[in-house]
């Protein structure tokens, strides 16, 4: 599971490639990606994620939403599906075949597993490589557009603790908001969400 921006790419033999967000907004400023995609002569719609591995979600968004010379070029288009009525593996392999020569467009590795033990092993590998989690797909139906598919499941690992809230530190930027101070096993610490106030408003 990649913690970036969902991106739909419309490729056409007649028109330049178009990158769109999940809600249909045109994504601009990623010419290092669209220049490569323009060399592909195919009529296909790709589905994937704009993402630079190793960066936080917030830093990925900064580089995607506003061009920063020498930094935005680290963003890659990670393709994991294409839109058609074909079964998933056919869609995936077709997408992989047309982007195989690209530098900034790459396929997301996909594995088949046949037991819970195998699934957990692949998931553990994903976590150790610094990914957010895993996406589990089952079934062979065609691409489902404009809906959350019941055949796709997010799989994450969590560690839960029960800590006592002993204080809330007000924010200098917005006094109505703050950071909770927690206590667990005689250890006091602050807990945040890693989101800015602007991100939380969004």
Task: Describe the residue ranges of each PLM region.
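Covalent nucleotidyltransferase
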Residues: 1-106
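Classical nucleotidyltransferase
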Residues: 5-10, 14-48, 147-202
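Short, structured patches in soluble enzyme cores that scaffold and shape functional sites
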Residues: 48-52, 79-84, 109-112, 138-140, ...
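Broad hydrophobic/π-residue packing in well-ordered secondary structure
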Residues: 77-82, 87-90, 123, 141-152, ...
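Intrinsic-disorder/low-complexity, polar/charged segments
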Residues: 87, 114-116, 196
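Amphipathic alpha-helical
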Residues: 110-159
């Amino acid at each position: 599971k990649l913690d970036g921006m969902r991106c739909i790419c419309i490729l056409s033999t007649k028109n330049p490639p178009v990158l769109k967000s999940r809600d249909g907004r045109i994504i601009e400023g990623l010419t290092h990606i669209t220049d490569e995609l323009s060399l592909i002569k195919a009529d296909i719609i790709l589905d994937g994620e704009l993402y630079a591995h190793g960066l936080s979600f917030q830093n990925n968004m900064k580089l995607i939403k506003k061009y920063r010379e020498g930094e935005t070029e680290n963003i890659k288009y990670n393709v994991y599906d294409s839109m058609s009525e074909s079964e998933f593996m056919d869609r995936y392999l077709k997408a992989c075949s047309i982007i195989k020569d690209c530098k900034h467009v790459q396929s997301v590795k996909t594995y088949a597993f046949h037991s819970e033990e195998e699934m957990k092993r692949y998931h553990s590998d994903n976590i150790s490589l610094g990914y957010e989690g895993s996406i589990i797909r089952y079934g062979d139906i065609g691409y489902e557009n404009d809906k959350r598919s019941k055949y796709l499941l997010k799989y994450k690992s969590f560690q839960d603790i029960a800590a006592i809230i002993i204080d809330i530190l007000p924010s200098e930027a917005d006094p109505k908001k703050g950071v909770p101070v927690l206590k667990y096993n005689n250890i006091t610490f602050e807990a945040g969400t890693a989101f800015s106030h602007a991100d939380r408003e969004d």
